[in-house]
Amino acid sequence: AARADGTMGFSSELCSPQGHGAEQQMQEAELRLLEGMRKWMAQRVKSDREYAGLLHHMSLQDGGGRGTGPYSPISQSWAEITSQTEGLSRLLRQHAEDLNSGPLSKLGLLIRERQQLRKTYSEQWQQLQQELTKTHNQDIEKLKSQYRALARDSAQARRKYQEASKDKDRDKAKLEQLGPGEPPPVLLLQDDRHSTSSSEQEREGGRTPTLEILKSHISGIFRPKFSLPPPLQLVPEVQKPLHEQLWYHGALPRAEVAELLTHSGDFLVRESQGKQEYVLSVLWDGQPRHFIIQSADNLYRPEGDGFASIPLLVDHLLRSQQPLTKKSGIVLNRAVPKDKWVLNHEDLVLGEQIGRGNFGEVFSGRLRADNTLVAVKSCRETLPPDIKAKFLQEAKILKQYSHPNIVRLIGVCTQKQPIYIVMELVQGGDFLTFLRTEGARLRMKTLLQMVGDAAAGMEYLESKCCIHRDLAARNCLVTEKNVLKISDFGMSREAADGIYAASGGLRQVPVKWTAPEALNYGRYSSESDVWSFGILLWETFSLGASPYPNLSNQQTREFVEKGGRLPCPELCPDAVFRLMEQCWAYEPGQRPSFSAIYQELQSIRKRHR
């Protein structure tokens, strides 16, 4: 922006959130352009190399000039053509190598620098905003304190002035009443007493408030005791950046769109997976339809007129009821807001890697807003869309649950890649490692309390018709106060009738923890979770030993089918082992419910010293 004196500088508008949003949009657009340039150059290098190879191959096919002699004009022409073809091949190959080692390489470095610059800019802006807010609040509190002190002093001075004014008025009235005459004669005692009482009456009469005093008093009652700040200048919704729009769902997997769109004309905007494109998804005639929002010359359009931003485009389509395309005739009706659980990537500060899952790394972190400690599960960007949808299945399950023995969901980051699931950070680590490192020092009552926690969490899931399918010590977490929480809901499913029929092979199935009917027929239920809970009990009281240690998965299946079961751990109470055996009943209907298991464990714990 240009200053009034003609020099160039930054406009004050860039200091506002709107300016920050515009700056971020510009950075995103530049990065998308650079990525497009890099892809174009890489394709050019590839094409030039392939073309050079084909030309070289053609130049080697010199069969046409054989037998004509070296002095034949045709032979000489053919030799010249093949020579020039070989020269062109070398030139193209050299050009491709120069492009690859020069501009393409430097462009890659530039992209990384711009990405780092964008990250640094965002972090610095957040830090400045926090410092500004903190300083602003401190200044306001200081001014408030000064104002209150001045208000008290003013009120006290006003009261003193009013009292002095009343005394002055009374004295003046008394003097006027006495007049300029001689002093009165000496009175008798009775007259003096009467005079005194008359004087008191006069003084009492002097205290009667006048109409003006009453008005002043009443106005003081209704006068506001504080000043209000001036109203803020609100930013119209259409001028807010894309990531602040309620209908922008970020990198939402395509598979989840159908669940959010329920009525004809419902729509949302999302980022295309694997491509730097935005997609407008609309429900029409009972089917979700997906339109790529074209971007050219910094204008956005599905077809026809272009707009400077996607919010302006969406606002126009909603207001005008203009069809998205002439061919489709689809009209936008209702924007579907993003989930309340959605967080921005900028809301997180990532820490060190603390683990690795099936979908990607797990990091520690904090929420910028209040420094809450969190665990951040990431999903690798290279995974196919259907796998990314499975990654979000865990968050979809946990959104509905709240229990002290179920790990708590904080939110999901789907606004851009990579996708994150944000959960409470349980700092004690997983239960299996805890048993192997701390188990020997734990009292029996503590172990009973911890498996009781697991039973309480599973009883809650059972009441919600949720089947965990992967219950094991490795998938439970321990707090610093030895409270156990059920975690890892990646394989969990909800079933209205309490039974889930799985399809596919056993590649991902934990065979040694899984009930026979689930392995044989793919039939999962709370009863199959009870079988897994029996294995969890065995892991607990064997202090983290591996079940069926000398058997393969196939041998374990055959052993269980023949009636074989795990032996009683050395330090396990008899009552707990009897409960394990009940959990391992071959028929699902003969296994106890989690409610009964919880009650039995509570009873055993009370009896145990």
Swiss-Prot record:
* Positions annotated as active site in the UniProt record: 470
Q: Which CDD domains match?
A: SH2_Fps_family
Which molecular function terms from Gene Ontology are attached?
Answer: ATP binding; non-membrane spanning protein tyrosine kinase activity
The F-BAR domain extends over: 8-174
> Residues bearing Phosphotyrosine?
500
Query: EC number(s) on record?
Result: 2.7.10.2
Q: Which reaction does it catalyse?
A: L-tyrosyl-[protein] + ATP = O-phospho-L-tyrosyl-[protein] + ADP + H(+)
Domain SH2 stretches: 247-336
Miscellaneous field: This protein is synthesized as a Gag-Fes polyprotein.
Report whether Lipid metabolism shows up as a keyword of the record: no
**Regarding domains, what does the record say?**
The F-BAR domain is truncated and contains only the FCH region (the coiled-coil region is missing).
Query: What name goes with this protein?
Result: Tyrosine-protein kinase transforming protein Fes
